[in-house]
Amino acid sequence: MNCKFCSFGDKWNIIKEKHILTDEEILARVRIQVENGAHYIVLRTTEFFSIPDLISLVQKIKKNIPGTYRIVLNIGEFDLDTANTLYEKGVWGIYHTIRLREGKDTFFDVKVRQKTQTAVMNSPLHLITLVEPVGIEHSNEEIANSFLINVQKNTLINGAMARVPVLGTPLGDKEAITSERLAQIIAVLRLSGGNIVQDICVHPATLSAIKSGANVMVVETGAVPRDAKYTPEDWAKITIQSAHQLLQSANYETRHRF
């Protein structure tokens, strides 16, 4: 959809090769994360990925990998009937946010994305959002407004994701925010979330951001919109082991120690 910060845009001609993970490859990766204490398993797809195929994959994961983990999807637009079906088939939550400068730095219709959020909120699914992708171009007011709108939607998981410059995209020459700025934003979001926001997520995670109030971080692999290349290993060398270590360094207790 040619978002100005995303490596996936056809217009930018950055991604040259097609990669499709088999169900077996996905199951193997999920199993590693679950066995090492991952609480959420997020399946991120391209905008128009087949929902029936995704449901089939979710059911395979639930059948073959035991555990108390929760499955979250980051997918395209859908209606209430689909939301209810996803829940019935084992999905716990949906990541679907209105990004900063949606419709300007992206080519998505804000109203369409809001409609999908409403479908999630009217179903048993849990809505997950982040203030993202935060860059030096965004004002305090934009960031605060995005977060407060998310809070009004009773999102259990909120937080912030920094924009990672990808050369070749329109925003690729704009520097990223500093780790200090990201930590500051996380601290403000934690204090402002009150008793509504259960978890504060930060991505990419830093120790300062974790110490500032984030308690959820992301380990990702595969097609990453913040990278010009396919990522067969954990992106930016953030592994499930290093995630545990980072959280433990900030005095959080996790299921495993490394």
Language-model segment annotations:
Residues 1-11:
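Local cysteine-cluster metal-coordination motifs and their immediate loop/turn environment
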Residues 10-25, 33-53, 57-58, 62-120, ...:
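Core AdoMet radical
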Residues 26-29, 54-61, 82, 112-119, ...:
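A general structural detector for well-ordered alpha-helical segments in enzyme core domains, enriched
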Residues 43, 93, 108-171, 186-200:
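Conserved C-terminal portion of the radical SAM core fold
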Residues 50, 103, 137, 167, ...:
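Generic structural signal for helix capping and beta-alpha/helix-loop junctions
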Residues 79-88, 135-151, 203-213:
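Catalytic cores of alpha/beta
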Residues 151-258:
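Auxiliary Fe-S-binding modules of radical SAM enzymes
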